[in-house]
Design a protein with these regions (language model features):
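Non-heme Fe(II) oxygenase catalytic core, chiefly the N-lobe of the double-stranded beta-helix
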Residues: 2-226, 231-265
Length: 265
């Protein structure tokens, strides 16, 4: 049985586990179940190297390949402007990654915490009639939307690089488990068939609702930490830090397990 402790009532659990048992996948099924139920799992003091981090990721599912700047599925995260705004990874692709595993290699002297918000719980707390209405809507997700604030004065080259990243997704993800979660965040450009002003207002309201303190866990990093989150049921963002600090995180992602299809698919 896993030794766990809830970090907040609605999101996040700390897991105390022997590194050898973790890498051997002894508790893999329990970890996957807990991850889906709690959204974020924190393991402290593991000091896993990149090979061990990959081995742990592989106990959760197939390691996702193909993102920019990756080495055998690993992404070295220094500073990606869009990550400072609430988002879900891979909303342009179907299926999006199931989970993400992150470990720090160099920490900034201040700032750089990572926050997570529970999109399952946020949906569950909406009135039933609003839940049903939102479940009829589709949203266009674009990299341009995600970069609007992160790159306030884009070049033509920026626009060209963003053009290929677009997807139409349901506003509410109906999971195979029967649960539903909101698909929102910085990549959400606009709601199909809705006036752009009404669309903006609704998306902003849902984001403010979902990122209330009661739905959020904020992780303050220490060397040796490993954090894994359910990318299909959470939003996340990095808090600001000194970009000259050399902060570096190593990341692996797990292939998606279920599609985020359009309503008409």
């Amino acid at each position: 049985v896993l030794n766990t402790r809830e970090l907040t009532p609605l999101i996040g659990s700390e897991v105390v586990i022997d590194p050898k048992a973790l890498l051997a996948g002894v508790h893999a099924d329990e970890i996957r179940e807990l991850l889906i139920r709690r959204g974020v799992l924190v393991m402290r003091g593991l000091d896993l190297d990149d090979g061990q981090l990959a081995a742990f990721t592989a106990t959760i599912g197939k390691i996702r390949q193909g993102a920019m700047h990756e080495e055998n599925g690993m992404l070295k995260v220094l500073s990606i402007p869009g990550t400072h705004f609430w988002h879900i990874d891979g909303t342009y692709t179907d299926p999006p990654p199931f989970a993400t595993v992150l470990a720090p290699r160099v920490l900034a002297p201040g700032g750089g915490d990572t926050e997570f918000a529970n999109t399952y719980a946020a949906f569950d707390d909406l009135p039933p009639d609003e839940q049903e209405y939102l479940s009829t809507l589709e949203v266009v997700h674009t990299m341009k939307a995600a970069m609007n604030y992160a790159v306030p004065e884009p070049t033509v080259e920026h626009f060209q690089s963003w053009q290929g990243h677009r997807g139409v997704r349901p506003l509410v993800w109906r999971h195979k488990s029967g649960r539903r979660s909101l698909v929102i965040g910085a990549t959400a450009s606009h709601i199909l068939g809705m006036h752009f002003a009404d669309s903006y207002e609704l998306l902003q309201r849902l984001l403010l609702h979902t990122t209330q303190d009661k739905y959020v866990y904020r992780h303050r990093w220490a060397l040796g930490d490993v954090v894994v989150w359910d990318n299909t049921g959470t939003l996340h963002r990095a808090r600001p830090f000194d970009l000259t600090s050399g902060r570096q995180m190593h990341r692996f992602a797990v292939e998606g397990l279920e599609p985020l299809a359009t309503l008409s698919a």
